[in-house]
C-alpha cells in the first residue's frame, strides 16, 4: 500500500495499479464521490488484490469507500467519464514532510500495477483533484529517440516487459521525459501474485544488483558483474547511486514456506536488461541509497493498511530476534550513524546503578518476569554448553537458550553503559544522553523480541493485561535449558472426609499454583483447602509433597501468604537449603506487578517499572503478605546459610514453648549477667494469679468496693511442699549450671534499682509459703548472708512473693490468707487515698521470693528466735489478733446490752472518722456473731452516708494497738464503752503471734501510719 517506504532511500510510486484485465477500461479513478458529498476532495486509486483483480479505494484513511451505503453502480455512475488513457501522476517537487516516516526493518511492500492495454484518449487533468499526484503516462504510440520504452501488449497476453535495448531507465524527471518513472513516494518495488495466492518477496541479502533474462526461469533475477555504477547530476542535487545485487529471491507463500520463482506456473512477467546500458537513479535530498533488509523479515502487502491501527511498534535494527535465534544484521552505515549520534551528544546525564525496563504499553507483567530472570543467581551460575554468563568466554551468545541469550544481551547492554560512565565534579556518575537512550532502546528491543516469542502461544496483545503466571511457563517451555532449572516434581495427596475419594498423583511443573492455604503453611507441610471433585464437598484438605526440586523452586499464591516473615518459609530438602530470593508482588488495587530481589546483605531491591529509573532498597518489605504473588526459592549451601544475614522482614522468632532440646550454656556464659536475666524473666500474669498474701499495698485493695452485705472471712491455710522437690522452672527461664560460681553480693549489684512495686489484687485462691531444698540453702549460705536480709537490700524484691501453681502440697507453716465470699471485680480506687499505707523504711519491707537458677533457692523460716518479721507479715498478724480481740469484746458488749434490756443509741456513721463507718462487716465462725456484727457495724436506721472510703474498722484497730502499748492484754473497743479482757482469754495462737511481734522494730511506726486515713 502506498505511504510505506522501501528503506532504500529512493522515492516510491505514487499509486498501485493492477496487473490483470479491467472490464471497465474507460473508468477514471478521479475523486472519491463519498468524500465529494461531504465537501472533501480525495483521489481514488487502484490497488491489486492478485494478478487478475484490483480494488478501487479512496486515498483518505478515514473514508470507507466503497464500503458505504450507496450501491456500487451509483458510485460508478457518478464517476466522470474521460479518456481511455490512465495517468500515473506525481508532483515534480516532493517535500520531506509529505513523505511518511521511515521504518528500518518492518517495511511492507505495495504492488505497482500497470494498465493491461493503453488507450489513445488522454485523461483531462481537470477531472483530478488538486492534491492528486501528477505523473507522466505510458503509451505504446509515443516514441522518444533513444529514451523510450515500448510496451508490446495485447488483451490476451499478460503484462510483460520486453527486451529493453539501447535505452537506459532513468528516474530523473526533471527533463520531462514521458517514459521515465519518478518515484516520489516511499513505495517498494512490487509484489508478484499468482492466481491462487499472493507471492511475498523476501529480500535475503544486500549485494550489488543486476537483472538478467533467462528463458528457463523468466522470473528469476540472476546476478551479473558487468553492471556499472553511474552518477546522475542535476542542477539541484548530486546523487551517488549504489546498485546492489540481490541473490535469487524466494517467494513466501501464505503458509510461510519459502519457494522460488520457478514455482509460478503462468510466468506472467519477465524482466530483461541489456548488458550495455547502465541503470541510473536520481536520489533526492535527505534520502539514503542503501538497502537494509535482513534475512528474517518477510514483506507482505496489506490493502487496508491506512485504515488499520498499527498493533506492534517498529523493531529497530538492534532488535534481537529470539524467535528464530539468529544474529542481527546491522549495516556498517547504521553503525557509523550511531557513533556520530553518540559523539554529538555532549550532554551528560546521571545514571543509576540498576538498569531495567521502563513501563510502556501496560507491560509490567513482562517487565517483572524479565527482571526476575536477569537477576536470578542460579541462571547466571548454570553453564550453557559449558559457558557461564559470568565467564569471560561468554562473548558469543548461546543460540540454544532463549533465557541465556536474554541475560547475555542484558549484560552486554549494561557493559555498554558502564564503559561510558564518567564521574563529574560532584562525584556523580554520568553518561552522554545519547548513550543512555541507546541502552534503553536495546532493552526495549529485548522486551519486544520476548513479547513476539510469547504472542503465538499466550495470545497477548500490546496494551493488554497479562500475568507472569502464564507467561513464565510458556517461555520456559520453549527453552529446555532454562526449563530444567525451574522444573520440580510434586505429589498431591487428597482424601475426602465425606466420600473417601482419594487422589495421589505426581506432576511436573515449572510453576505451581496454590489457593486457600492454611495459616501454618510451610513448603514441607503444604496443606491447602480445596473441593472434592467427586462429591463437591468444600473445605477438604489437600497436601503437596515435594518429590524432586531443581535449583529454583517457584510457587504462585493466589491469596498471598499468611505470614510476612520469610525466614519461616526457608527449608532444607535433600541436603540443600532453600531460601526465598525473589518475590513478584501483585497490587490488586493498581493491578500492577513489581519485582523484589533479595541482595547479599539482606536488603530488598525494588524494581518497579513505574518508578523507572529509580530502584530503591528496603530493609523490610513495605507491603502486606497478602500481595506475595510469586515466590522463588533458590538453593544455598549450609555454610552460606549460617553466614548470611537473616532476612529483615521480621524479628527473630522467640519460642513460646519449651524445645525438645533445651539450650546448653557453657561455663564461660554463666556470668552474673545471664543469671540476672534468668531472674528477671518472671511472668507477671502467673505471679498475680498465684499471690494471695496480704501486703501493705494489697491491704486496702482487699476492702475496696465492698458493700454492706459482703462477708469477709479470715482463715488459716496450711500448705506444705516436699523438701526434696525443687521449684519447677518456667518455660521462659534459662537455667544456669548448678556449679555456677557466683556470689549473692554480685548478684544483687547487677540488678537495677527501682522503686516500682507490684500490686496484686486479691483472689479467692489458697497460697502457701514454699520451702526450698536444703541443698539450695546450703549453697547460698556460703556468702555468710541471711537470705532475708540479702533480698531486703533491693526494692525489686520488696513486693509480694510469687507463688507456684496450686497443685503443690501445702506446707506445715501456718499462713493466714484473706478470703471473701462474693467473687466480684472491685472498682478502681483513687491512688491518692492510700498514701499512708506506703512503707516508710525501704530496708525493712518484705523481701520478694524468687527462684534462683538451677534450684538455688534459700529456705526462709520465720520463727520467734530468728530475724524480725517484715512489715507485711507483721501487719497481717496484727490485724488477725486485733480482729479476734474485737470479736470477743463485741460479744461481751452484746451480753451487756441484752441483760440491761435497754436500747443503746447507735452512733451516726456519716463522719469518716467514726469507728462505725465501715464498708463491710466481719464475722466469726457462728451465725449469731455474724448477725450481731452486721447490726452493730452497719446500722440501717442511722447510716446516711456509707462510703467505700470509710475505714473506721482500721481506726478502731489502730486505737486498740495504742492501748496495747501499755498493756498488751487490754484493748479499746469504742468510745462509748471500754471493756477489759484478761490475758487468759487469749488463745495460745495469739500468744505465739504476740511473741513473734516483739521482735519487729516497725511495730509502732508502721501501724501509726494508718492514722492518715482517720
From Swiss-Prot:
A Pfam family per the record: Peptidase_C98
GO-annotated biological processes: Cajal body organization; cell population proliferation; protein desumoylation; protein localization to Cajal body; proteolysis
Record field: compositional bias (Pro residues): 802-815
Domain USP stretches: 355-636
Positions of the catalytic residues: 364, 592
Localization (cell): Nucleus, Cajal body
Keyword Protease: yes
Family per record: Belongs to the peptidase C19 family.
Function: SUMO-specific isopeptidase involved in protein desumoylation. Specifically binds SUMO proteins with a higher affinity for sumo2 and sumo3 which it cleaves more efficiently. Also able to process full-length SUMO proteins to their mature forms. Plays a key role in RNA polymerase-II-mediated snRNA transcription in the Cajal bodies. Is a component of complexes that can bind to U snRNA genes.
Full protein name: SUMO-specific isopeptidase USPL1
Species assigned in the record: Danio rerio (Zebrafish)
Lineage: Eukaryota, Metazoa, Chordata, Craniata, Vertebrata
